[in-house]
Amino acid sequence: MPRFQLVEEPDALVEELRSRGQLAVDTEFMRESTYYAQLCLTQVTAGDTIWCVDPLSGHTQDAFWKEMLSHDWVLHSGRQDIEVIYQLAHAMPASIFDTQVAAGLLGMPAQMGYAGLVKELFDVEIHKMHTRANWSKRPLRDEYLEYAAEDVEYLLPACEELTRQLDSKGRLAWAQEDSRWLLDPDLYTNDNGQTIDRLKGARNFRGRKRAAARRLADWREKEAIKRDRPRQWILRDNVLLDIAWNLPRSEADLGNIQGVPGKLVNRVGHRLLEAVAQSASDTEAYDPPRPPNEEQKALLKEMQSRVAACAESLGIAAETLASKRELSAIIIAGNRKSRVFNGWRAELIGEELRRLL
């Protein structure tokens, strides 16, 4: 088992970190009862001791995060870790190297897990038996801390080995570029205008009813953020859609909709009615995007074929080069800022795809 030290006063670690260089970082968090993920543990190592830093101990941690963010980090599949830390510290680390990204550029599975990577590189078995642990409960059990520490134990050696292999193939800059993309704050910023897209069943709504659903979804999003509670705790999807479909004009109308709880009407009925009423003045087109036509389907198929051929020549998965979702956004939504048209992808496949448009 890895050596670890539980740190209950995060700021006390600052001097120790100050003399270190690159850091391997992982987090444990929970979001079952909150809108924002609750950071429950941060694992950090510079190659010797593994520190398990407890953010729930009640001690200050501003100096800790200021120091942490001044370092270069190594993470594995780090997008969620970065999101949690960005919400907490409102800043990004100096740079990151994502070992999952790097592995994909060497022809390993595009979404290879940490345990799979460690097995592939070092022939070491890591057992993921505590993925569903309650990380917010204190005190943390020793086996939880050992499991958490293991999640960073091999990150720095993995970074070193992946860097060596990438450099030998002339792909190190690719991994650095794709890792840097994960530090774009826009990836972690809420876009309330897109909240309706998260609603299953909203695709069947048109005109005023869709406008009402969007207004209600926007209200729910803001309320969930304000109260730091899951969206479904504020207003369940099916209830939201039922309200939008019926377009109630009074609390009596609202209460008569099957499935709308009376306590919901009493608590926020006026807010729901206000959102529905505001939708009457919406002039923007709220109809859902049209499904791709035959010409667009043919173009997507051709693009996928060319991406697959290029990816095969590189020995990497097609989705590592350009996913179906990215290609669809280019064709249907007109996304000309896609990473497919930028950086290392532009020369390999982006310009070829652009000529098809």
Name each model-derived stretch.
Residues 16-19, 66-70:
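Flexible, charged surface loops at secondary-structure boundaries
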Residues 3, 43, 48-61, 67, ...:
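Active-site-proximal helix-loop-helix substrate-binding element of RNase H-like nuclease domains
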Residues 142, 162-357:
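Accessory DNA-binding and partner-docking regions appended to nucleic-acid-acting proteins
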Residues 28-45, 50:
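An N-terminal structural lobe/cap that precedes and organizes the functional/catalytic core
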Residues 1-23, 27:
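N-terminal accessory regions of nucleic-acid-interacting proteins
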Residues 9-12, 59-63:
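A generic local structural motif
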